[in-house]
């Protein structure tokens, strides 16, 4: 085997071993080294130069970037996810006829759709969908993201939250939890504007929690300005807006007429 390919393969094995034991700091260090080593492969995008080991180099590079995307989910780093996904995407599109399809492709594509949904980048979400084949759209990972977006846009928040239980892979849970938090924060913002207080039972139902304890934990962590007492959640009172000062209409009229007379003299 080519010495450079051997070095990358050995380093990747060390990465996967660290990943298996959840040593994500070591994974990040090894990933940085792997990305540097990959720059020596001229068979990779964007050059795609032909070489005896081109297929092997493309395959291992794709595997590395797929692991990088999943690592970014484990470390909850959305910026790293976006960078690594953009580096991975050419292997799914431009290299499609050079190497067999990855078994992880649809899972990764579904993760990216979820990320766009969480970040409220709906236009990009639909742009990505347009690039997928009809067969890919039928994949459970993709269908899950599409159905989630439809429920989200319809305001069917109960369906969005319950979809966490049917996530096609454990890696989806991170984005599902972010989406749930976004939904609850939106409901909470509307509720505290609409009501001075609500019962704990009503608050639990509005915020889509299954128990009072979950609600109380949410209030403590996310809304310490709320007060829970005597079976009610008391929202922080909105600051009263200062009354508008009276507009000096007569003064404005006199000034306007004065300006008009001055302009008339100039003309």
From Swiss-Prot:
PTM info: Ubiquitinated by PUB22 and PUB23.
Domain PCI: 79-251
Disrupted gene: phenotype observed: Decreased rate of leaf formation, reduced root elongation, delayed skotomorphogenesis and altered growth responses to exogenous cytokinins. Increased sensitivity to heat shock and increased tolerance to oxidative stress. Decreased 26S proteasome accumulation. In flowers and cotyledons, epidermal cells were larger than those in the wild type.
Record key words, sorted: Acetylation, Cytokinin signaling pathway, Proteasome, Ubl conjugation
Acetylation recorded as keyword: yes
Tissues where this protein is expressed: Ubiquitous with highest expression in flowers.
Record-linked InterPro entries: 26S_Psome_Rpn12 (IPR006746), CSN8_PSD8_EIF3K (IPR033464), PCI_dom (IPR000717)
Gene induction: By cytokinins.
Ubl conjugation recorded as keyword: yes
Biological process according to GO: cotyledon development; cytokinin-activated signaling pathway; flower development; leaf development; post-embryonic root development; proteasome assembly; proteasome-mediated ubiquitin-dependent protein catabolic process; protein catabolic process
GO CC term (a single one): nucleus
Residues bearing the modification N-acetylmethionine: 1
Family: Belongs to the proteasome subunit S14 family.
PANTHER family for the chain: 26S PROTEASOME NON-ATPASE REGULATORY SUBUNIT 8 (PTHR12387:SF0)
Function description: Acts as a regulatory subunit of the 26S proteasome which is involved in the ATP-dependent degradation of ubiquitinated proteins. May help to control the degradation of one or more factors that repress cytokinin signaling. Plays an important role for balancing cell expansion with cell proliferation rates during shoot development.
Subunit structure of this chain's protein: Component of the 19S regulatory particle (RP/PA700) lid subcomplex of the 26S proteasome. The 26S proteasome is composed of a core protease (CP), known as the 20S proteasome, capped at one or both ends by the 19S regulatory particle (RP/PA700). The RP/PA700 complex is composed of at least 17 different subunits in two subcomplexes, the base and the lid, which form the portions proximal and distal to the 20S proteolytic core, respectively. Interacts with PUB22 and PUB23. Binds to the translation initiation factors TIF3E1. Interacts with UCH1 and UCH2.
Name listed for the protein in its UniProt record: 26S proteasome non-ATPase regulatory subunit 8 homolog A
Organism: Arabidopsis thaliana
């Amino acid at each position: 085997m080519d010495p450079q390919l051997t070095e990358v393969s050995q380093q990747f094995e060390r990465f996967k071993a660290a990943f298996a034991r959840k040593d994500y700091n070591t994974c990040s260090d090894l990933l940085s080294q792997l990305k540097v080593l990959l720059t020596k492969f001229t068979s990779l995008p964007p050059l795609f130069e032909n070489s005896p080991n081109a297929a092997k180099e493309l395959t291992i590079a794709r595997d590395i970037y797929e692991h990088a995307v999943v690592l970014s989910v484990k470390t909850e780093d959305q910026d790293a996810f976006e960078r690594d996904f953009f580096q991975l995407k050419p292997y799914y599109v431009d290299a499609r006829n050079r190497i067999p399809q990855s078994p992880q492709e649809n899972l990764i594509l579904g993760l990216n759709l979820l990320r766009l949904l969480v970040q409220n980048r709906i236009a990009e979400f639909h742009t990505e969908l347009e690039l997928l084949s009809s067969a890919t759209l039928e994949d459970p990972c993709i269908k899950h993201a599409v159905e989630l977006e439809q429920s989200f846009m319809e305001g069917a928040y109960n369906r969005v939250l319950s979809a966490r239980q049917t996530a096609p892979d454990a890696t989806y849970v991170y984005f599902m939890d972010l989406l749930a938090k976004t939904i609850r924060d939106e409901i909470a913002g509307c509720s505290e504007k609409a009501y001075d207080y609500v019962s704990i039972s009503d608050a639990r139902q509005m915020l889509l929690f299954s128990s009072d304890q979950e609600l109380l934990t949410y209030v403590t962590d996310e809304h310490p300005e709320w007060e829970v007492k005597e079976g009610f959640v008391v929202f922080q009172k909105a600051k009263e807006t200062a009354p508008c000062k009276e507009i000096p209409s007569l003064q404005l009229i006199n000034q306007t007429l004065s300006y008009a007379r001055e302009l008339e003299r100039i003309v």
